[in-house]
Amino acid sequence: MLKQTIKKWNQSIERYESGNVGEALTILTSIEQSTSKINYNIGVMYIKSNNFRNAIEYFNRSVEQDKYLASSYYMRAIAHHMNGELNHAIVDYDETISKLRGHEYIDYKQLGLDHKLLLAEVLFNKALALGRAGSSVALQATQCFSQPSDSQEFKNQCKKIQDGSQLNFSTRPIPLSLLFKPPKVSDAPQKQRSATTSSIQSSSPSTPMSSSPPSYILKGPSSPPSSSSPSSSSPSLSSSSSPKLPPTPKPSFGSSPPPSSSSSSSSSSSSSSSSISPLTNKTLPPKPPPLPSKKLPSRPISCVIQDVKITLKVFYKDRRLIQIPVPCNLSTFIQKIELKFEITISDKFSLSFQLDGEENEINSQVQLDKMICMEINEINVKDIIPSPSPSPSPSPDKTNNSTSSYSSSSSSSSSSSSSSSSSSYDNKPKSSFIPKTTTRPILPPTTTTTTSTSNNFNRNATLPKKFGSTPSSPSFSSPSSSSSGGGGGPPIPTRGSPSISLLKQQNQTQSINIPPKVPTSSRPKMTQSHSPPSSSPLSSYSTSFQSVSSPSLSSSYNGSTSSYGGFSSSRPPPTPYPYQVLYTDSNEKYYLNTETNETFWELP
């Protein structure tokens, strides 16, 4: 029965090597008592035919018959991998690694398969099955001492798997052209036995002459030594007709036949046993390796190299422990502290550690790496108390060239007021030309003779009507009867305001003549003249009206500063001596010469 099995096994291998995979499968599957090696060969043939389901079934049978056959686990993993069942493939790769038992390869040449199963190739296929998660497994494959024959290409492929740049490499199975071959011990014992029997038969014809001494047999019976027998020279012995008997051999040369035959047989048996014993030793299979003390777990993802972790003590309101991997990035470190203390690390917290009595803040990856390298395991988390922000300092007053800026602002305001007065009759005021002032100065007292201007401002003042428009409820009054010079002009509309009372007191104390105005219908065109006013009211009006400005038209409360002509200043420029600024009831500015009591619309 065993002979028929081996014969069919050899026939199937011959058919497979010639390319007839179907015939080889038919012959192997017809064997009734199949072994794990035969089932392995059938599984490889089914992989060759791309029938992965049947291949997995026969590899299962092979594993059931020999649970230590790592090649069957490996090829079953290849079948699962090529069939798209990556999870099962990863499990079988792990089983293959466990069957290697810490070795980097298994040489199956003694069992009839001329191949070495390498741990590096098993890890390579597992990294392919894991995809992007197999970078660490590919790194382990490159660190193995036993590498495939194409080691350089193998390392390049492993490096690409680590980088994740390419994951479509083909698997590395045991070559499908290699199969387990049957042992060649069926005819060897018979040949050895025939050789031993022929050697024994060749030595059998010399057995009858074994009773005579060896020296006599070699020399022959016709030439006995003359010196050996001292009685050969006597005539009585020579003349006798009785045959001569051979002399008795010496004890040193003689040997009895039974011991010689037994010794020869024993020597032949010892030689035959010595010649057979090497063959019997070669045919015996090697002893199986010892079983592992602890069964390794079988799971889809298992790594030989584990991540190194360190434990840190974090002090905030109490002490708590965290574990971080090595190496560790700053975001992972902060996230673990946040999860442990249930806080959010932001600008309100600071992380620090003590080194040589100095406190170093952990605000970058460099500081974190420094802490790990120095093996510091205590971290402090502190609240940051925000410092009070300083109050903004007021902007410096632009006092330089205040006189020139005021003159330019007064000229621009005069032009804007003139344009607004000329267009007030058409109900189209040009508000864009009105200077933007922020406060309204109060009329200064009449007793002052200096050129300084008061810094008091009326913050509750309301915006008056635009220049040239008629007030809503005007009241008319004429100048005082005690006024001298100037003559009477057109009536001036007045309304109740703090400046009116001051003006009345001033008119009572001294005689002030307000310069007359011409009717608006005959008002002349404005001229850019800076000459002193003439005697005629018309020329006085035409030369002085261009500098008239109404600061109350666009005045508004804005702290304690005013804007004149686009420049920020705390007070208006001073008026030259002996002139004083006054305002009419309609908020029109004019100038008073305190020495001559003459009034002007513009400074001469």
Curated annotation (Swiss-Prot):
Compositional bias (Polar residues): 502-528
Keyword tags: Repeat, TPR repeat
Residue stretches of biased makeup (Pro residues): 244-260
Record's function text: May function as an activator of NOX1, a superoxide-producing NADPH oxidase.
Keyword Transmembrane: no
GO MF entry, a single one: superoxide-generating NADPH oxidase activator activity
A GO CC annotation given for this chain: cytosol
UniProt organism field: Dictyostelium discoideum (Social amoeba)
GO BP: superoxide metabolic process
Region span, Disordered: 180-298, 383-581
Gene disruption phenotype: No visible phenotype.
Protein name: NADPH oxidase activator
Segments of skewed composition (Low complexity): 194-215, 225-243, 261-284, 396-424, 435-453, 467-483, 529-570
Further facts: Although it only shares low sequence similarity with members of the NCF2/NOXA1 family, it may ensure the same function as NCF2/p67-phox.
TPR repeat positions: 36-69, 71-103
Residue span, PB1 domain: 309-384
PANTHER family, per database record: NEUTROPHIL CYTOSOLIC FACTOR 2, NEUTROPHIL NADPH OXIDASE FACTOR 2, SH3 DOMAIN-CONTAINING PROTEIN C23A1.17
Residues of the WW domain: 573-604
